[in-house]
UniProtKB/Swiss-Prot annotation:
Keywords: Cell membrane, Cytoplasm, Lipid transport, Membrane, Transport. It comes from Xenopus laevis. Its main location: cytoplasm. GO terms for cellular component: cytoplasm; plasma membrane. It is found in: Cytoplasm; Cell membrane. May act as a lipid transfer protein. The keyword Cytoplasm applies. This is Tumor necrosis factor alpha-induced protein 8-like protein 3. The gene is tnfaip8l3. Pfam families: DUF758. One of its GO terms (biological process) is regulation of apoptotic process. Residues 1-10 have a biased composition (Acidic residues). Belongs to the TNFAIP8 family. The keyword Phosphoprotein does not apply. Residues 1-24 are annotated as: Disordered.
Length: 202
């Protein structure tokens, strides 16, 4: 899934025992199928509607901020790919007990990050770029740790690209500016995040 051609690259999952594992093969087969689909199709299949709407708003604000549609598309495509891959690993019970503890820690940190992001939007003059950036970087670290033995260096690079973009303090400052052009995007993003928080998805 790390290749645009759709071929299942060797090492997409970290090498395991020499013997054949039908479960591992099934995971790789799913990855191969998903790699041939468009990003939008993957999102529709494996990501709920509210998350898809949030991703769409993130794409719009990223495109406007970087002034480059291709670069914005790359960031969001990487975001969706990472989400899908982690979802596949989780669904197929690929995580060890120790890794499941990391999953729980990641969920808690992501929940804290989302609640903080929404609070900074809803309560004027509370926004702290360093706090939000720090939380996002903590999420990135936990995600790297979670998929360390499962995904390739290319996937880890995708994780870095996604989190480094959204945790960039200049981007966050522009996004949360009361006088800026990004306020409508932030409003819709926070509405979606609030919905996921209410539904206990996050």
């Amino acid at each position: 899934m790390d290749t645009d051609s759709g071929d299942l690259s060797e090492g997409e999952l970290s090498p395991g025992p020499e013997q054949f594992s039908s479960k591992s093969f099934a995971v790789q087969a799913q990855k191969k199928i998903l790699s041939k689909m468009a990003t939008k199709t993957m999102a529709n299949m494996l990501i709920d509607d509210t998350s898809s709407e949030i991703f769409d708003e993130l794409f719009k604000v990223t495109k406007e901020y970087v002034k480059n549609k291709k670069e914005a598309h790359k960031v969001l495509k990487d975001l969706v790919k990472v989400a899908v891959k982690v979802g596949i690993l989780y669904r197929n019970k690929q995580f060890s007990l120790e890794e499941l503890e990391i999953v729980e820690n990641f969920r808690k940190k992501l929940n804290q990050t989302c609640m903080t992001a929404v609070s900074f939007f809803e309560v004027e003059y509370t926004f702290d770029k360093n706090v939000l950036s720090g939380l996002l970087h903590e999420c990135k670290t936990l995600l790297h740790e979670l998929v360390q033995r499962h995904l390739t260096p290319k996937s880890h690079s995708r994780i870095d690209r996604v989190f480094n973009h959204f945790a960039d303090v200049e981007f966050l400052t522009a996004l949360y500016s009361l006088e800026g052009n990004y306020r409508p995007y932030l409003k819709r993003i926070c509405e979606g995040v609030n919905k996921l928080l209410d539904e206990r998805v996050l």
